[in-house]
Amino acid sequence: MEKKWKYCAVYYIIQIHFVKGVWEKTVNTEENVYATLGSDVNLTCQTQTVGFFVQMQWSKVTNKIDLIAVYHPQYGFYCAYGRPCESLVTFTETPENGSKWTLHLRNMSCSVSGRYECMLVLYPEGIQTKIYNLLIQTHVTADEWNSNHTIEIEINQTLEIPCFQNSSSKISSEFTYAWSVENSSTDSWVLLSKGIKEDNGTQETLISQNHLISNSTLLKDRVKLGTDYRLHLSPVQIFDDGRKFSCHIRVGPNKILRSSTTVKVFAKPEIPVIVENNSTDVLVERRFTCLLKNVFPKANITWFIDGSFLHDEKEGIYITNEERKGKDGFLELKSVLTRVHSNKPAQSDNLTIWCMALSPVPGNKVWNISSEKITFLLGSEISSTDPPLSVTESTLDTQPSPASSVSPARYPATSSVTLVDVSALRPNTTPQPSNSSMTTRGFNYPWTSSGTDTKKSVSRIPSETYSSSPSGAGSTLHDNVFTSTARAFSEVPTTANGSTKTNHVHITGIVVNKPKDGMSWPVIVAALLFCCMILFGLGVRKWCQYQKEIMERPPPFKPPPPPIKYTCIQEPNESDLPYHEMETL
């Protein structure tokens, strides 16, 4: 009985100290919070205790105290009016025996404004209370700072987009940030990440990109939030071209920083492939095709004959351009050059033709890639191809244009692919229509004349547009639909004084000469095939006759079998023993 009274006395003493410690100290603080209509607000109160937590609650103070939510370490959460507590309040334990009690208010309206009280019951500190005056701003104009940027990057690389864009001096130690991406199909924005930067340096991510764009196949598993609130996109794809990412920073109730970044994607194309199409009569018409694959954005294909850029509209040469867009976003360009034979005398017996692709790359430059060269003789079927040109990257220096009385001669056989700075070049051709896209280029054309041995180096800066033209038919393909544009060009240009040009390109390959009797190669091939068929038929007939002779021959002679030898069995005599007696022996 005495032990029971001792335990009761100790229990009551502890309860008295507990109640005394709880009501010993009360801390009250008050803070004003400003919010705009339709925004989300998070009210947070945090503290650290020496002992343990007893209870935490949120209430709205009007004429009376309306309970919103209660948290007890043993019994858990309770929210009034049957509202779900998962989206309304959160309790987070912080290091060093601390805690954070947050109330989430979504889609702010005038009815939500008022006084909100956060009460923390601690032992042995006592009761701590913090009151928020939530005010709704309806006609307050925020001080916005907007900045727009463009980042150029090649495909399959990692894109890093800073949020502040050199404006860190305008940002305080505590702010709210959010990353979003523009949805071009619906003309809306999709939230990627949202968080809060506290005064003590901690960062809290409220919404991560995994929860909002998990169903998006274009940005899934490619967006991450790095240090200094930078957004990382890896790897970059063709479909990211033109995509706009925006970072919103709210420093205070009246100050918003907004930075938008537009992505521009580039892809280096493959080396263009030039082939000569089969024609029924090469003496009347010759056709060449230049194919460029895996290019983005759109590139330009230009043609050269004996080093002369085809830009003058004359009779004899026609060019048709086609564009195709694949499912992967890459473009495939095709240019067909048709040369019609002219009765005018030519300055040279052979011509060398090739194509060049001019594709834009980051840094306001152009990537020039030349195909192999095809050389053919005029008035015959002889044609050959040179090996592909070497590929180099360099800066192109421009020189004054030559006089109008001198036209450029053949391109050297050891030309190179050059990276041209578009910003340093100026076109010297006629202006293009307003709806055409212009690409300027610079080339060096060495030429020689029969009257002098001096070699001059001249720079031409031709400019060509393939998007639209008053004299040609436009061509664009989307979703595997082909359209084309056609342009007419001239024969090979010559010098004004009629000087003879020398071609230093060596002809290699297989040469097929035309027979003297005028018989074309299809007739020869048909005759050879006919002879082969006759020989094959004769062979089959001979084999059938041989098989028939074998079947009609008489069977071979077989000798008769040898005679059968018969033996005589003698009957037993009376003197012989019977069988059963012989058996007993």
From Swiss-Prot:
UniProt GO cellular component terms: cytoplasm; plasma membrane
Chief site of localization: membrane
Transmembrane intervals: 520-540
Tissue expr: Expressed on normal T-cell lines and clones, and some transformed T-cells, but no other cultured cell lines tested. It is expressed at very low levels on activated B-cells.
Extracellular side: 22-519
Disulfide bonds: 45-118, 163-247, 290-355
Protein name: T-cell surface protein tactile
Keywords, ordered alphabetically: Cell adhesion, Chromosomal rearrangement, Craniosynostosis, Disease variant, Disulfide bond, Glycoprotein, Immunoglobulin domain, Membrane, Repeat, Signal, Transmembrane, Transmembrane helix
GO biological process assignments: cell adhesion; cell-matrix adhesion; immune response; inflammatory response; negative regulation of natural killer cell cytokine production; negative regulation of type II interferon production; response to lipopolysaccharide
GN (gene name): CD96
Taxonomic lineage of the native organism: Eukaryota, Metazoa, Chordata, Craniata, Vertebrata
Cytoplasmic topological segments: 541-585
Cleaved signal peptide residues: 1-21
Region Disordered, annotated ranges: 385-475
